[in-house]
Regions:
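Alpha/beta catalytic cores of group-transfer enzymes, especially the acyltransferase/condensing modules
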Residues: 1-143, 172
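Flexible, low-complexity segments
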Residues: 138-192
Length: 192
């Protein structure tokens, strides 16, 4: 069932071909969010990923991405990097994908989770099947608040961060936000 969902989500998201994503390093997320509002007349652009205190990813239409990138440099960003991605993920431009995925998720048989799942909003702990369905759809157009997720987990008493990945992508971001956590990478070759 999980593989079918991943395939359906990917298929729905691949249909949205307008727009992209840009990483902004050296400015805090609130500043980047303000800059997005300042360039709104050029097109849709919004914060897509709150990765670390000074790394934020924006998503939107190309003209607006260019405008927010230029303004970010003027306001002191250390780097602005256009990401090599196929769409404007975690933005309102993905609404057609969210609607298509909602149709798939509505018939999904889910049970109440024994272990709560932390939502992309960084604060909501989900167990109810209806809440999980709504969150699965919302995360297609909504931002990933990774920094908030880490803060929430630390407040809950989490002391170790385990990344399951061929290479360490999240650990460097997590370390910037929560340096006191213990970090472990589990890759194809075992624990690193």
């Amino acid at each position: 069932e999980g593989v079918r969902l991943v395939q359906a989500r990917g298929q729905a998201m691949s249909q949205v071909k307008t727009g992209g994503m840009t990483a902004i390093l050296g400015l805090d997320g609130q500043t980047v969010e303000t800059l997005c509002a300042e360039v709104a007349s050029t097109g849709l652009v919004q914060v897509a990923n709150w990765n670390s205190p000074f790394q934020t990813v924006v998503s939107g239409e190309f003209r607006a991405l260019e405008a927010v990138g230029t303004l970010s440099k003027e306001r002191g960003a250390k780097r602005v990097v256009q990401l090599n991605v196929s769409g404007p993920f975690h933005s309102r431009l993905m609404e057609p994908a969210a609607q298509a995925f909602a149709e798939v998720v509505q018939d999904l048989e889910l049970r109440v989770c024994h272990t709560p799942v932390l939502s992309n909003d960084g604060q909501s702990m989900l167990q109810d099947p209806g809440d999980i369905r709504r969150s699965m759809v919302r995360q297609i157009t909504g931002p990933v608040r990774f920094t908030d997720q880490l803060h929430t987990l630390v407040r809950m008493g989490v002391t170790e961060f385990v990344e399951l990945s061929p290479e360490s992508l999240l650990i460097p971001l997590a370390r910037r936000s929560q340096p006191n956590l213990q970090f472990t990478l589990v890759s194809d070759g075992g624990m690193v």
